[in-house]
Amino acid sequence: MTYFMFLLLMALVVGLVAVASNPTPYFAALGLVVAAGVGCGVLVGHGGSFLSLVLFLIYLGGMLVVFAYAALAAEPFPEAWGSRSVLGYVLVYLLGVGLVAGIFWGGWYEGSWVVVDGLKEFSVLRGDISGVAVMYSSGGGMLVICAWVLLLTLLVVLELTRGLSRGALRAV
């Protein structure tokens, strides 16, 4: 399990570097999918299965807007991963991550990252699942507002990427 978590954390770093280097919107969207999926996998590995599921669904809603932008912002000659500028950014980011990891390497194993009920022998309910009732009772209105904001953002991105003459909403 330790090797699997190490692999997930390294994939998370690679996904975040792919988003930060941002060669074209296509590849940045792919890096965002990798980072979101692997980040939720790290949460599942540490026992937060419900939190991971909710965050991944929120990421999918946000990535819908990113995919709409990436599909409509087509470039005739997109920069790929092999171009010099993108490789320069990737190397700088990876060296920065390596430098920061080298500085803070000692002492990372002194703490423990455990879910609230992870130390109990027999637990009927998990700590992250008991938050479902609170999320839907107290936060139900906020969930509806967030859904409408994501829809509005999607429509704004679709309208802005088509220009003034032919809007995406007029074509329907």
Swiss-Prot record:
Q: Which reaction does it catalyse?
A: a ubiquinone + NADH + 5 H(+)(in) = a ubiquinol + NAD(+) + 4 H(+)(out)
Residues folding into a coiled coil are: none
Stated EC number for the protein is 7.1.1.2
Q: Does the keyword DNA-binding apply?
A: no
Q: Which GO terms describe its molecular function?
A: NADH dehydrogenase (ubiquinone) activity
EC category: translocase
Q: Domain of life, per the record?
A: Eukaryota
Q: Which UniProt keywords apply?
A: Electron transport, Membrane, Mitochondrion, NAD, Respiratory chain, Translocase, Transmembrane, Transmembrane helix, Transport, Ubiquinone
Instruction: Tell me the membrane topology, using the record's own terms.
Output: Multi-pass membrane protein
The cellular location(s) given in this protein's UniProt record come to: Mitochondrion membrane
Instruction: Output this protein's name.
Output: NADH-ubiquinone oxidoreductase chain 6
Q: Origin organism of this chain?
A: Cyprinus carpio (Common carp)
